[in-house]
């Protein structure tokens, strides 16, 4: 092997002290050994060591973990801060072991306390067992079992069949009535006619007609009962019969069954009383000595079993030749018709008399009538209504902003060719209690015959009579709403032409006082026939802002159509 060339400043004395250790030639000292020594780096003899040995400042030392240090004497010591976990303990810097029974410390050795069936065999803990407990081939503790025990599911179970069963994890006998438990003994509950004999057997108590025959309970029978085919039968004869397995009675009219009772069917005049069958007797019939007889009144008699007349006729009647006759005088006003043989009145129908519906009546001329007592009286003069109104004291009857929010009194009084009217308004609710509009109007519309026109469209701030309001001819303090023609109350269509409500000839203007307060004067305008057709009335008042719209009685007048 060719050695590297040595530098001039190389010191051949170990450890060579060359300034560049990497260039140290491979010179192995004669005392180098791999046992604790090594040549690292090459040409340098160093100490081979592992943890916890290390070097510090060129000196060999120990790596110290938690709880270890080197004291001032250079000795390795512990600061007793060793961390332990259960069951190891540390008390006063002494490490110990925490244990409980069955562990114990004997002769400074940890031992195990035990009782039978545990035992120590060859320094091993063992279990003393005997059959049926055994150890199987897998060194597992097992149990030798036989039917009815079973351990197929890993649990020791008792196999059972009815009437045995488990109830609340307890083996019990399952039973129901008539069985019950009496002092933990299974007992049979019995009631008469069952009983217990002296041998504690269940027996049957019976009395006639029951009997025991061939160890079977049977029935002693006598007529009309018989036993046939194991069934009890009833022998019957007419009028008794068996129908639908029921005993019945064969009956014919007039017998019938009412409310499950046998009864006699009767038709008038027969009836049923508490005492028996009876007959209702009408007029002319009576009972005499338990016989039905004819009750004869005056003028009748029985002759040879037949009813005959026994009359003493008084005038104008007479009884002659077995006939009752009427005598008629020549001046009586009565005549006998020879054809119909009827008595007629000989009336002079040309002088105030007539025959109507077979009655003699008086013929009445113009201006005469019959009063409620049937007397002839003079007919009263026909009275023409002169007033149309909403009654003297109406309920809320007008709608302005909401249904029935005002009460309106409107009166039209006919005076020859004029109508004098009045209108007043009482606010009831809503906006009318605090109005803010500039003007508020009330309108009435009429057909061409003068009758009230309902459901006519209105504009803002206008009120009309509600459909439920009362409007008609005055009748006392109320009104007759049967108004079929009231043209005579309507404004003249010539004087107040239609569709000219904005012109002066169709209007009237005056003043009134809101709420009747002289300090709140407001204008009042009446307009006639402002609508497109028919007749109309429109009344308009100026509004005081937020002041209740109560209008006192306002008067108006106009020329009528007729």
UniProtKB/Swiss-Prot annotation:
The keyword Acetylation does not apply. InterPro entries: Adeno_fibre, Adeno_fibre_knob, Adenobir_fibre_prot_rpt/shaft, Adenovirus_pIV-like_att, Attachment_protein_shaft_sf. Its main location: virion. It is found in: Virion; Host nucleus. It comes from the Viruses. Keywords: Capsid protein, Host nucleus, Host-virus interaction, Late protein, Viral attachment to host adhesion receptor, Viral attachment to host cell, Virion, Virus entry into host cell. SUPFAM superfamilies: Fibre shaft of virus attachment proteins, Virus attachment protein globular domain. Induction: Expressed in the late phase of the viral replicative cycle. Belongs to the adenoviridae fiber family. All late proteins expressed from the major late promoter are produced by alternative splicing and alternative polyadenylation of the same gene giving rise to non-overlapping ORFs. A leader sequence is present in the N-terminus of all these mRNAs and is recognized by the viral shutoff protein to provide expression although conventional translation via ribosome scanning from the cap has been shut off in the host cell. Homotrimer. Interacts with host receptor CXCAR. Interacts (via N-terminal tail region) with pentons. This is Fiber protein 1. It comes from Human adenovirus F serotype 41. The lineage of its organism: Viruses, Varidnaviria, Bamfordvirae, Preplasmiviricota, Tectiliviricetes.
């Amino acid at each position: 092997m060719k050695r590297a060339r040595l530098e001039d400043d190389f010191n051949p004395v170990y450890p060579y002290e060359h300034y560049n250790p990497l260039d140290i030639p491979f010179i192995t000292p004669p005392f180098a050994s791999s046992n604790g020594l090594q040549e690292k780096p090459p040409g340098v003899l160093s100490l081979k060591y592992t943890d916890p040995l290390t070097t510090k400042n060129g000196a060999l030392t120990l790596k110290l973990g938690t709880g270890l240090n080197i004291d001032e004497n250079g000795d390795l010591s512990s600061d007793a801060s060793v961390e332990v976990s259960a069951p190891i303990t540390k008390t006063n810097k002494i490490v110990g072991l925490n244990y409980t029974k069955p562990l114990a410390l004997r002769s400074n050795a940890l031992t195990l306390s035990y009782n039978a069936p545990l035992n120590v065999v060859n320094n091993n803990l063992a279990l003393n067992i005997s059959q049926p407990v055994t150890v199987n081939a897998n060194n597992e503790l097992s149990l030798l079992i036989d039917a009815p025990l079973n351990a197929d599911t890993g649990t020791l179970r008792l196999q059972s069949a009815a009437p045995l069963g488990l109830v609340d994890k307890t083996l019990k006998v399952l039973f129901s009535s008539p069985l019950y438990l009496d002092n933990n003994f299974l007992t049979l509950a019995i009631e008469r006619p069952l009983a217990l004999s002296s041998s504690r057997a269940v027996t049957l108590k019976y009395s006639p007609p029951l009997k025991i025959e061939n160890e079977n309970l049977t029935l002693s029978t006598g007529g009309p009962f018989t036993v046939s085919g194991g069934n009890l039968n009833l022998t019957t004869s007419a009028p008794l019969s068996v129908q639908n397995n029921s005993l019945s009675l064969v009956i014919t009219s007039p017998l019938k069954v009412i409310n499950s009772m046998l009864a006699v069917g009767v038709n008038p005049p027969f009836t049923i009383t508490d005492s028996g069958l009876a007959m209702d007797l009408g007029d002319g019939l009576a009972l005499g000595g338990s016989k039905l007889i004819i009750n004869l009144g005056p003028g009748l008699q029985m002759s040879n079993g037949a009813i005959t007349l026994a009359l003493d006729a008084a005038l104008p009647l007479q009884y002659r030749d077995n006939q009752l006759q009427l005598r008629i005088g020549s001046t009586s006003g009565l005549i006998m018709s020879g054809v119909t043989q009827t008595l007629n009145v000989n009336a002079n129908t040309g002088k105030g008399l007539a025959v109507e519906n077979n009655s003699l009546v008086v013929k009445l001329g113009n201006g005469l009538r019959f009063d409620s007592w049937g007397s002839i009286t003079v007919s009263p003069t026909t009275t023409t209504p002169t007033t149309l109104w909403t009654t003297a004291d109406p309920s809320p009857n007008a709608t302005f902003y909401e249904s029935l929010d005002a009460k309106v009194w409107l009166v039209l009084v006919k005076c020859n060719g004029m109508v004098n009217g009045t209108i007043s308004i009482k606010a009831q609710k809503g906006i009318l209690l605090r109005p803010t509009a500039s003007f508020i109007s009330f309108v009435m519309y009429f057909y061409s015959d003068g009758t009230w026109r309902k459901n006519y469209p209105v504009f803002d701030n206008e009120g009309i009579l509600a459909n439920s309001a009362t409007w008609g001819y005055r009748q006392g303090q109320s009104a007759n709403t049967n108004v079929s023609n009231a043209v005579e109350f309507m404004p003249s269509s010539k004087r107040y032409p239609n569709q000219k409500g904005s012109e002066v000839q169709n209007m009237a203007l005056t003043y009134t006082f809101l709420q009747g307060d002289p300090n709140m004067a407001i204008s009042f305008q009446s307009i006639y026939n402002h609508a497109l057709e028919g007749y109309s009335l429109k009344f308009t008042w100026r509004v005081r802002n937020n002041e209740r719209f109560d209008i006192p009685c306002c008067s108006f007048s106009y020329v009528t159509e007729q």
